[in-house]
Design a protein with these regions (language model features):
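Short intrinsically disordered terminal tails
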Residues: 1, 178-185
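Acidic/glycine-enriched connector segments
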Residues: 2-7, 14-168
Length: 185
C-alpha cells in the first residue's frame, strides 16, 4: 500500500437503485477528495459510472475490457488501463480460477471478468454494491477480493442509512490503521 494514496475499488451493479448510486458517488467523492484515496473502477454504467462521477479525476483508475468500452463516460484526466491477454495474462487466468462457469463465457464477457482482476489487484479495500442475487461481475469481483484477502464492504439494495455511515467510518478506520502500520514498519 502506498503511504500517500490508499486504493479503494468501488464495484457494483449496472442497475443500482437511487440510494446505491448516490452512496457510491458520495463514497468516491469523500474518499478521493478528503482522504487522498485513489478510486479504482470499471467504466460500466451504474455503480462504476457513479464512482467515476464522484471521484477526483486525477485519483481515478478506470479499467476497461477493451479500448472502446464506454469511453464517453470516463472523465478526461482519469488513468485508463485496457485489459490485454498479452500484457495481463494473470487477469485472464483469474477468470478460469474464480468464475463458476468460465468455460461457457464468450470472449467479450471473459474480458469483462478479466478486467475485474485489474480493478482489484492493487486495492486496499473493496466497496461493493451488488444486485439482489449478488452474481455477475460484482460477484466475480467479490470472489477475487476474498481470494486476495482484500476486505470487502457490501452495500446491498435496501440497506439502512446507519449501515452506510458505519461503512464509511469503518473504511476510513481501516485505511488509517493500514497507513499507521506501514509507517511503523
Amino acid at each position: 500500500m502506498s503511504l500517500a494514496q490508499p486504493v479503494v475499488a468501488i464495484i457494483g451493479t449496472r442497475n443500482p437503485d437511487h440510494q446505491q448510486e448516490r452512496k457510491a458517488r458520495f463514497l468516491s467523492y469523500e474518499l478521493s477528495h478528503s482522504h487522498n484515496c485513489t478510486i479504482s473502477t470499471g467504466a460500466a454504467y451504474g455503480i462504476d459510472e457513479a464512482a467515476m462521477k464522484g471521484a477526483l479525476a486525477e485519483k481515478l483508475n478506470v479499467y476497461l475490457p477493451w479500448s472502446s468500452y464506454n469511453r464517453e463516460i470516463i472523465p478526461d484526466r482519469a488513468k485508463i488501463v485496457v485489459a490485454s491477454e498479452r500484457l495481463h495474462p494473470h487477469w485472464y487466468a483469474s477468470v478460469t480460477k474464480y468464475h463458476p462457469a468460465a468455460n461457457r463465457l464468450k470472449p467479450g464477457v471473459r474480458s469483462l471478468h478479466a478486467r475485474n482482476y485489474g480493478i482489484l489487484e492493487h486495492a486496499d479495500l473493496v466497496i461493493a454494491f451488488p444486485n439482489a442475487d449478488g452474481g455477475g461481475g460484482t460477484g466475480q469481483g467479490i470472489r477475487i477480493a476474498e481470494a486476495l484477502n482484500i476486505p470487502v464492504m457490501q452495500f446491498n439494495k435496501g440497506a439502512e442509512s446507519v449501515l452506510f455511515s458505519c461503512m464509511l467510518s469503518n473504511a476510513l478506520l481501516y485505511l488509517d490503521r493500514k497507513k499507521t502500520d506501514a509507517i511503523a514498519a
